[in-house]
């Protein structure tokens, strides 16, 4: 798999070639990580582009080949050569999948509907219990007690539900160290081999936490 770099990326990676293969890119990223531990890989790798290997000759790209980008993209998707590209948004822990966002919204709506139904059942059950427990009282007093109980239960359940939604996420204890590990697998059609890039960023909130030994 071949990757086209921007001028800024070439400068930062100290590379004089416009295109590099997967192994070269992995090696240069490791070296860059050693020199600059505060680098934001999400921003840095945003402009990396995949190019077909047959459009590269002696390390140079034919600038007119950009007109074939749509066709090239379709071919690459069919050949499943995007193994290394989905990591670009995920390296910062950001999900760009609209399908996942849609599922999250549907899940939230489902939870809200379930909460409303549960609150209604609680109110109806409370009113029914109060009505039968006060059978010896007059109708006016029974109605007043039922109304008071219904309002009290409704306010309490609504308060608890809103409190639950606004609750802060649980924080990890101080005896944990935060560690994030990114794994990048590149399938290079030229070399027919795989290599993994593991980058540890200690200062960024973790996707995987490990206890202090």
UniProtKB/Swiss-Prot annotation:
Q: Where does the record place it?
A: Endoplasmic reticulum membrane
- Gene Ontology cellular component annotations, sorted alphabetically: endomembrane system; endoplasmic reticulum; endoplasmic reticulum membrane
Do you know which InterPro entries this protein is assigned to?
A: ATPase_Vma12
Keywords, alphabetical: Endoplasmic reticulum, Membrane, Transmembrane, Transmembrane helix
Q: What is its main location?
A: endoplasmic reticulum
Q: One biological-process term from Gene Ontology?
A: vacuolar proton-transporting V-type ATPase complex assembly
Q: Which residues form a coiled coil?
A: none
In terms of domain of life, where is this protein from?
Eukaryota
User: How does the protein associate with the membrane?
Assistant: Multi-pass membrane protein
The UniProt record lists the keyword Transmembrane helix = yes
> Per the UniProt record, which residue ranges are transmembrane?
113-133, 142-162
Q: Does the keyword Transcription regulation apply?
A: no
Known role: Required for vacuolar ATPase assembly.
Specify the protein name.
Answer: Vacuolar ATPase assembly integral membrane protein vph2
Organism per entry: Schizosaccharomyces pombe (strain 972 / ATCC 24843) (Fission yeast)
């Amino acid at each position: 798999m071949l990757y086209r770099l921007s001028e800024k990326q070439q400068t930062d990676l100290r590379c004089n070639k416009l295109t590099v293969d997967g192994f070269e890119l992995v090696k240069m990223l490791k070296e860059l990580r050693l020199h600059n531990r505060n680098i934001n890989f999400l921003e840095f790798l945003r402009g990396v582009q995949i190019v077909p290997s047959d459009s590269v000759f002696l390390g140079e790209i034919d600038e007119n080949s950009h007109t074939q980008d749509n066709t090239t993209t379709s071919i690459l998707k069919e050949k499943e050569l995007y193994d290394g590209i989905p990591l670009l948004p995920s390296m910062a822990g950001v999900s760009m999948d609209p399908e996942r966002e849609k599922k999250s919204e549907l899940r939230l709506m489902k939870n809200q509907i379930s909460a409303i139904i549960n609150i209604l059942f609680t109110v109806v059950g409370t009113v029914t219990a109060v009505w039968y427990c006060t059978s010896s009282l007059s109708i006016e007093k029974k109605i007043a007690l039922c109304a008071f109980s219904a309002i009290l239960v409704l306010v309490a359940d609504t308060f608890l539900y809103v409190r639950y939604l606004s609750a802060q996420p649980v924080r990890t204890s101080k005896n944990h160290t935060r560690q994030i590990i990114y794994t990048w697998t590149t399938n290079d059609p030229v070399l027919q081999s795989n290599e993994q890039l593991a980058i540890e960023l200690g200062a960024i909130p973790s996707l995987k936490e490990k206890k202090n030994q």
